[in-house]
Amino acid sequence: MIVVQVKDNEPIERALKRFKKKIDRVKVLKEVKSRRYYTKPSIKRREEKLKAIYKQHLQQQANG
């Protein structure tokens, strides 16, 4: 469970920002969104393969 202690005289916006950062680091929302619907293993593999190809293409573009 993610807990954020609100300090004395700290604006709630700042505490909320720290809470959101902690959630992003733990990748809670990403996992919840991915589990919302069932995706077949073949589709997962296809998406991972396309993502790897895309990353490789970007790396080649950066290196020249």
From Swiss-Prot:
Show the GO MF annotations: structural constituent of ribosome
Q: Name one GO cellular component term.
A: ribosome
GO biological process: one example: translation
Record has Ribonucleoprotein as a keyword? yes
Q: What PROSITE patterns would the database entry show?
A: RIBOSOMAL_S21
A Pfam family recorded for this sequence: Ribosomal_S21
Which keywords appear in this protein's UniProt record, sorted alphabetically?
Ribonucleoprotein, Ribosomal protein
InterPro entries in UniProt: Ribosomal_bS21 (IPR001911), Ribosomal_bS21_CS (IPR018278), Ribosomal_bS21_sf (IPR038380)
Q: Which family does it belong to?
A: Belongs to the bacterial ribosomal protein bS21 family.
Q: What is this protein called?
A: Small ribosomal subunit protein bS21
Q: Which gene encodes it?
A: rpsU
